[in-house]
Structure formats: structure tokens, C-alpha cells
From Swiss-Prot:
Top-level division of the source organism's lineage: Bacteria
Matching PROSITE patterns: AA_TRNA_LIGASE_II_ALA
Species classification: Bacteria, Pseudomonadati, Pseudomonadota, Gammaproteobacteria, Aeromonadales
Pfam families in UniProt: DHHA1 (PF02272), tRNA-synt_2c (PF01411), tRNA_SAD (PF07973)
Cysteine disulfide partners in this protein: none
Designated gene of the protein: alaS
Residue numbers binding Zn(2+): H563, H567, C665, H669
Protein name: Alanine--tRNA ligase
Native source species: Aeromonas salmonicida (strain A449)
Amino acid sequence: MYMSTSEIRAAFLEYFRSQGHQVVSSSSLVPHNDPTLLFTNAGMNQFKDVFLGADKRAYNRATTSQRCVRAGGKHNDLENVGYTARHHTFFEMLGNFSFGDYFKQDAIRFAWEFLTGTLKLPKERLLVTVYETDDEAFNIWANEVGVPVERIVRIGDNKGAAFASDNFWQMSDTGPCGPCTEIFYDHGDHIWGGPPGSPEEDGDRFIEIWNVVFMQFNRQADGTMEPLPRPSVDTGMGLERISAIMQGVHSNYEIDIFQALIKKAAEIVGTTDLSNQSLRVIADHIRSCAFLIADGVMPSNEGRGYVLRRIIRRAVRHGRKLGATDVFFYKLAAELAVQMKDVGAELIAQLPLVKRVLRIEEEQFVRTLDRGLLLLEDVLANLGDAKVIPGEVVFKLYDTYGFPADLTADVVREREIGIDEEGFNAEMEKQRARAKEASSFGVNYNEVLKLDFETPFTGYKQLSQKTSVVGIYKDGVEVNGLIAGEEAVVVLAETPFYAESGGQVGDCGVLKVDDGIFAVTDTQKAGKAIIHKGYLELGTLEKGALVEAVVDGERRQAVALNHSVTHLLHAALRQALGDHVTQKGSLVGAERMRFDFSHFEGLTMATIRRVEELVNAQIRANHDIATQVMDLEAAKSAGAMALFGEKYEDDVRVVRMGDYSTELCGGTHAKRTGDIGFFKIIAESGIAAGVRRIEAVTGKGAIDFMHQMGEQIEEAAALVKGDQFSIADKVRQILDKSKMMERELEQLKAKLAAQAGSDLLSQVIEINGQKVLIAALEGADPKSLRGMLDELKNRMKSGVVLLATSSDDKVNLIAGVTSDLTGKVKAGELVNLVAQQVGGKGGGRPDMAQAGGTQPEAVPAALQSVHSWLEERL
């Protein structure tokens, strides 16, 4: 019975709804509050806390069709996608779940009833496996369901340890775990392969379609298995696999959704070979890329963004392989939205963003793709009998041309060649070490000071307090005291000084003691201890001394204003650009602030102005800035934004600014948004692929900036003899005049070059009856060589021309051959002959070619060598 993919999905959810299950929407591909996961890769991910007992739901039975991505991390088999029948970066997992409700009997019954009743699969085509010692599951299959015992396979511990089996599931080394039973479909004896547990089990005849996990134990650290008080069920069935069976095909790429995408991709790139594996790659990759972007992931050079970038670039490379000459990948997103309309509401809503991001990413990559492929072809041509591309070459392709290592591997595998992964990783480590060395400044206090206590911070409510010195450190070594002029780090019993964190700079101020003053120039953290860096201005300071710690209040207030505005800016950027915007970093100082965020293109002036208006509107609204400490889950339920990658304690501080912004933040803030006064963006730039940076000023700093800009405009207006209202027109007039003069200058240079070319005709010689001109020109403009060459070829009618000019350490070469002689002499070969002798290389067409070099002193000998070379060819 044929069923479309959409019909199967709907039938699955409806069947389990009728069995009392709550139909739950697919969660985002970005896991919520689970830093252990790169992407959502299974249906149970969104219920993990429910299974662990940390979360409760209003239902105890659920069913989903979960979007999943498996690429990167331990699931990195990207190179196989498109080349096998069932490898994908994106797939849908159908699942039903019991949270302490039903267990083995009902779970097995539901699965069998759906497969044989709803889908009407032939029972004789189904085979099941159980864990070797799970007699309960075996008996349910044999005695209650009626599966013949010869079609029930017991699978033992086949992974080298107790309870390490294909049929024993565990969440991690400890915690919930249990046996599972799997259902396989037999595609028939015309396909090679054996049943699970046999030597031929890796064949394609028997395909797993449903895995039913019975969570019945809690694994302890010592390996003992304690029964769970409320056993649960977690199941998963790949939608693409069951669709292939229901549609009578063997490969997932032959099902309806993939065929529609493959046909559309073929139409876009202009190919008629629908069996080409590159079309499979593209059809798979548009699914993962589009849904990842719709769920807020942007291409970048790290983490999830880098996995997305790798997938996009692999798809682009396969498109070029098929003959695509223009950007194409983004055009497939609309067809995907049509095919996934039943479950793709997020994709449809974000379709304009998805297409824009894919187009921009492809445009950026194709600029270097062809050059990188040329380099790779060069390497392959000179590889000889070797079967591995050196790691240094793989790294150069990554570092210079943006080729992820697996993309290079994908290209060369077609020649049955591999890559040196160890060598590549070694080069990556060298680069990381260089970056770390280049960015290292000052002292890493976490490494130098091994402090094992926590300093209480009192600075939210006060800027000064009496406290005591519990430690003094000079150059990382603890000392008992200081004298005037000495630099050191001081640790207090408690402090009102804010230590740098969350992008906010550390406080400055003074520590006052009876006969001395310690100037605090910076405040940092060493572990959980707060340390005060500075120097003793006068007097002495000893360990144990009572001091008055006084924060520079004016500076703290300026920093607080700038910190508060980062929250408003974050919210405004998400409102103006979309929910994909997330904070990537910040620096909040007293004079200005900067804010790094995920976005794929530069902001237009109109967008910058809109963001400024949104922020300033919230400043004028004069919202109360309220802070509250609550537990992490309650904070997230209240809508507080958490930054991915940040580690949070169980209790967190929530900063709320009206209804506009709610974030988790430990920094200091203004009392009301109106205290900020005024917000002005002074710069916007890209700092990495997929990451933009805004620099801005607030309050008095913003007013000072506007005054400075006004003064500069007035000064510029005076220079062009205008005023602030006519300056743009005046500058435009000057630029137009400058362009006209540049054109006249180029025309004059061309005339002079033509004249010089005429003068060179007296140096023409004959080699084997053909005219040849070889000349070194002193002080000639390299830009004029092309015009000079054309003039000489026209005047000579037939012949070979080679011109060289040099200045400082640079050589410029150009060669020309008239069309009647290109069968004997190629300009590209001629210019390359000389270039190699002067420390360079070059190339071009048979009739004209250019090159460069770095050894002017070698030019005379190189030109002389041309005579004998031409004698052999003319």
C-alpha cells in the first residue's frame, strides 16, 4: 500500500493520539539547555529532563515527529551522505514516549499494531531483536504478539563490556538505561545481507526501522543496575526509512520528498542525469541547512555555525561539479518549504532569511572555490604514486580558500585518494597556539594564583565598605606586605569591587588604610576569588590590615549605563534583524561599549538608524531596571535569555527592563533606562564570518561624539568652500573633476606608451625569418605595458614580443604573439619561462600573457635565454 511521506507522518501521530498520547511539536534543532549536544539528534532530546525526573509535564504519554541533524561531533559521517542509501545530515524521527506510564507490553503492542495494522506491512517481512537476557520482551513477542521464535533474535553484549550491546541503551556512563527491542524489515533475498547478529548483518537486506527502548534501570558509578521506580519507554522510527518501504523503493533518496528536491535541483543547475550522486548530496543538504538557519544557526567558523558552513560548502561544490556557474543552492529552499509544508511552519516563516543567508554564504565561497580547486588539481597532478594529500596542503586549502577538511576529502575520494588528517590537525594546533600567543597579554591569574575560596561581592548595593586584606601577591608569589611604589594583587575578605566578567570591565578605585592608599587599577577573578590589581601610592599595606574599599563611583555609573544599553541593543537587534541574532561577546567600558552578535551581512545605514531609534525609544520610556535572583529553570520560563556556552549556577540573576528585555546577567546596571540618556552607534563592522560588531557611546559620551562630528563636518565644509548643508554636493563635484583628470592622464600615458612602442621597433630582430622584439624598459609604468604591447603587435603585423620592467624588488613581464604564430609559440609558455628565472610565475592566453617576479637582477640573463628557446620553436 503506497503512502506518501506526509501521509505516513500524519498516520503515525494520529495513531498514537488515539492511544492517549499528547502530540508534541518538534523541538528546535538547537537543543534547549543541553550543552552536551551540538544538535537535536533524537526524539527523546526534548524529554531528557522528564526522563531524569527534573521536569514534569501535564501528560505522561507523548508522540512526536522530531527534526534531527547528525553532522559534526561523534556523528560526523558527512562524507558518506549522498553516496549510501540511508546516510543523511537531516532526518525526521517518529517517536512515542511513556514517562512512567505503560511499559514493555503496550510499547511492543503499539509498534506491531501500527506497522501491521495501520501500514499493513506483511508480518512475514518483519524480524525483531531483543537483549539476550530480556526474557520478558522475548515472551511478549512470541506469546502475545505471535512472532515465530525463529524471527526473534537475541543480541548479547557485542561491544566489549557488560551491558554494551546494540540492544542495550544508555544515556551516559551513569543514569537511566535499559534493554531495547528493534524491528527490522526484510527487503528480500535479491539484496545481499543477513539478519542482525549474523556475519552478514551489515548488508542492506535487513533494515532496522523501529527501536523501542525500555528505561528500567539506573546505572550507578560502580556499574550496578538499580531498578527505576517508574520505568519509561523511548522509541524512534526513521520517517525516511519507513517511507522507502511504503513506497516500494530501497534507497531513501528514491522517496517522494527527495525525488522532488532532486528534480528541482537538476532543473536549477541544468542537468538531466537524475541518478547523479551530487544531486543526492544537494537534496539532503538543503534540508539540514534550511532548517538550521530557520532555527537560528548562522554560518560561522566555530561550533554549530561551522558545521552549517561545512554542509553549505559541500553542497556548493557538488553544484559546481554538476555545471552550476551561478549561485544556485538558495533557490532550492522554496521547493523544500513546499515539500515540508505540513511540519515546516518555522521554515516557511523564515524562508526569506534562509534564502538570503544561503545566497550570501554561497557568493562568498565561490570567490575562492575555483582557485582552491586549481591548487588541489596542481597537488594531485604532482602527487605521483602517493595516495594521501599532505596535511599542510589540506590546512592551506582550509586557511586560505575556506575548504573544510572534509570538503577536500570529498573531492579527492573521487580519485581514490585520502587526506592526512593527523597532519591537518597538527597544523590547526599550531595555528591555535599562534593565535593564543598573539592574544596573550598580562597575567592569567587562574594559572598563577591557585585560590580555593570565594570572595563575597557586596557591590550591587554599596560602593564602599570596611573589610580586611586576606592576601597580597607580587608576581604570583604571596607576600606579607607592600611599601610605596610596589605593584601587587590584593585579595579582600569581601569587596564592593566588581570583577571583570560578562564583558563588563573590572572596577577601579582605592583601598584606604591608616597610613596608606592602594590604587586599584583593575579588578579580576582568579577562580571564585576577586582580586584587586594595582600599586601602593603611599604608606604601607600588610596582610590582615583593615581597609576601606572605595569604588570609583563615577566610572562605575558610566560602565553601568553602557552595560544596560547592551541589553536594549540586543533586544533591538533581534527586533530589527530577526531571532537568529545572538550575543557573541561584548566589552562594556566607561567611555564606550562594543557588542558582537551573529549576523550574516553588514548593516545598512537605514538599519543602523532603526536600531538606534528602537534603543532610544526604550531609553525615553524610562523603564525601571529590576533585578531578581531565581532558579535557572524559573528564569528561562519567565523568558530570560541565556547565552549558549555560558555556564550558569542553579540560582541566577535576572535583569528586566520593562517588557522589552529580560536577560540572565551578573553585571551592574542603571536604575532606570532613562538614566542612559542617549545612545549613538559610532561603528559597525565584521570581525569574523557570520559575526558583526557594533561600537557605541551613551549619555555624555554620545553628546561629545555628536559635537566632534559636527566640528569635523564644519571643517570639511570649509575645505571645500561650502557649508554643512552643501558639503555632499561639493565633494561630489570634486570627485567628478578628479575622475575626469584621471581619464585624461590615462589617455596621455597611452599616447606616450604608443610613442615609446614606436621607438622600440628599431630593436626588432629576426629569428628563423620571424620578427622578434625582446626589451627591458627602464622606469616604465607597469600599467602601460598592455597598451604598448598591442601597439607593437599591430605595427609588426606578425611576430613575438616580450617586455620587462622592474622597480625596487618587483618585476613585471608581458608577452604577446600574433595569431599566425600561436601554433608555434604560446605567450603563456614564453612568459612563464622568464618568470621562473626571476622568482615568479604567471600565465595567460596563447596570444597574450603576463607574469611577475621578485628578482630584478636576474632579468638580463632571463631575457637572453629566450633567444635559444624561440629558435627551437620558430
